[in-house]
Amino acid sequence: MKHLLLVRHAKSSWANPGQADFDRPLNERGHKDAPMMAKRILDRDITIDSIITSTALRALTTAEYFAHANEIPKSKMIQHDFLYHAPPERFAKAIVLIPDEIHTA
């Protein structure tokens, strides 16, 4: 059975009002909280085989913190443009695309 953990991106910055939403980075708090949340997953003895993420900057940066904590190389992260502002059916599509060898993402 596959297990899917849903994690929202860490706190993002609104410092540049003209910046495209897709390109908003994490703010200082986001950079502090993301590794702490990744550690909480590890502390619960949950082993993540892969990370699936939107390519939006704040989501990708958060995913990289989780990848680092779980020793998952960036090359093994699965990135989907279609997850940005995705309705439920796009998440279903991402789930179907998970390779068989991945048990927890």
Question: At which residue positions do the language-model features occur?
Answer:
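Short phosphate-binding loop-to-helix
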Residues: 82-99
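Flexible, charged surface loops at secondary-structure boundaries
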Residues: 45-47, 98-101
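Generic beta-sheet signal
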Residues: 4, 101-105
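Active-site-proximal alpha-helix that buttresses catalytic centers in soluble enzyme cores
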Residues: 2-3, 7-86
